[in-house]
């Protein structure tokens, strides 16, 4: 017990000293880890599911885009989301998607996912699948390098109508979009073009 008390006192003194070089080194590591801090900006909009506007908010983000959409997806079967992406492409928006390979292509019963991905490829969208991670669990849209949509909402019918999910949109926050764009680009580099399957 005395040894534990001594160790705790030493640790407390170590972290209490502002001038401790070791503490500065540890704090520097913590502060420079791979998290990002930025001032709040833009406007926040949220929605939920089932049937509480989550899918509609995702479609709103896509429909609001004017120049580009970068999207990361785990599950991808939502017909309204696919239709919104095709509409965006038709109005001249550059659409890029990186989707999880296993949950959309290689598992049995993935016909809806493959059809959704194929529809986007046939519309001229850049569609890639990624398999370098256990799962690619991202659910993010970066629109026009200004707006970020994220949350637990998979781009699927189940997420819209059966699951408890959330969507958060940060409108007009270019700094946040820049951080997510960097994450998107990393994953896009690791992904392979989706091959149409007939």
What are these regions (language model features)?
Residues 3, 94, 135-137:
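Short histidine
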Residues 23-27, 34-35, 143, 147-198:
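Signature of lipid phosphatidyltransferase scaffolds
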Residues 75-79, 101-105, 133-136, 147-148, ...:
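Solvent-exposed loop/turn segments at secondary-structure junctions
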Residues 58-122:
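Primarily the HKD phosphodiesterase
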Residues 38-40, 63, 90, 120-122, ...:
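Extracellular/periplasmic catalytic domains that process cell-envelope and extracellular macromolecules
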Residues 2-50, 55-56, 103-111, 182-198:
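Short, small/polar-rich loop/turn modules that mediate ligand/substrate recognition or access, typified
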Residues 45-47, 70-73, 96-99, 128-129, ...:
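Structural recognition of the beta-strand scaffold that forms the well-ordered cores
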